[in-house]
Amino acid sequence: LLGYGADPTPDLTAELDRIQRDRVRRARQMVDLIEAETGVSLDLSVGPGIGRPHIARAVAESSAPYDYAGAFGRLIGGEGPCYVPREITDAETGIALLRESCGLVSLAHPFRYRDPEAALEICAELDAVERYYAYDHPMDPAPVEHAIERYDLLPTGGSDAHDQRLGVAGLDSADWERVASRLPGAER
């Protein structure tokens, strides 16, 4: 889930803190597993904000026999020996927390879920869906377009930094204006 125009409540702050602690715990476990699996010491500082892309880059820059894609595919992807699952906030809790503190709540990258169609059903309770996202494989946008029409959603754009550059997938100015007009303090 994505929350836009946030004015964090204490409950949201507490949940974000828990997520960040889990993110660091998970990264530390994956780094430990990779180092044990490969016999290579990774040059990586594990702290807030770390994710698998950072770990994959560190693997690619090490003497381990994996490039960035190989680190995901062979080590830290969902089936990899060094993968550690996240403790994910359930959708109901996440939606409630974001509704209390955000002007706009959006479903993030719907094609990254095991069942994209089921994920898009959550949009019935949301304001928007991430229509533009830099997926690593071609996707048919029709299911997202259908959800946008069916639930009268705003399209949002991806901002994840999974590549070496930002701004790969985003909104055009007209779509951005529609999103911005729904945010707190918008004077349009």
What are these model-derived regions, one by one?
Residues L1-A119:
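Extended substrate/RNA-proximal surfaces in nucleic-acid metabolism proteins
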Residues L1-D7, T89, A96-C102, L107, ...:
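Charged catalytic cores and adjacent phosphate/nucleic-acid-binding surfaces used
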